From Swiss-Prot:
It is a multi-pass membrane protein. Coiled coil: none annotated. InterPro entries: UPF0060. It is found in: Cell inner membrane. The chain crosses the membrane at residues 8-28, 33-53, 65-85, 88-108. SUPFAM superfamilies: Multidrug resistance efflux transporter EmrE. This is UPF0060 membrane protein Ajs_1473. GO terms for cellular component: plasma membrane. PANTHER family: UPF0060 MEMBRANE PROTEIN YNFA (PTHR36116:SF1). Pfam families: UPF0060 (PF02694). Keywords: Cell inner membrane, Cell membrane, Membrane, Transmembrane, Transmembrane helix. The keyword NAD does not apply. It comes from Acidovorax sp. (strain JS42).
Amino acid sequence: MELLKVAILFAVTAVAEIVGCYLPWLVVKQGKSAWLLLPAAVSLSLFAWLLTLHPTAAGRTYAAYGGMYIAVALVWLHVVDGVALTRWDFVGAAIALAGMSVIALQPATDT
């Protein structure tokens, strides 16, 4: 699977996980309707299913996915929570994405 496809799949997976966790947070922390727990459950189920579509062993998938999760979480922080990102956020995301790329693009025959 090429890097663009892997990156898109990781990004969609991260959004599903973040939505699935953010909605219950709204219920608990901001007193929003408990009905938000239903789409949260759907989103977390989608997240779990999306993880099965990744092209490698589960542990390696989770390790590589972590880099994309960091980047998507920072975008969420800015867009949804309205928090300005710092240069350190950008540097950290770049390092995490570089790590994701190393793990995701390693040769299949490397031991």
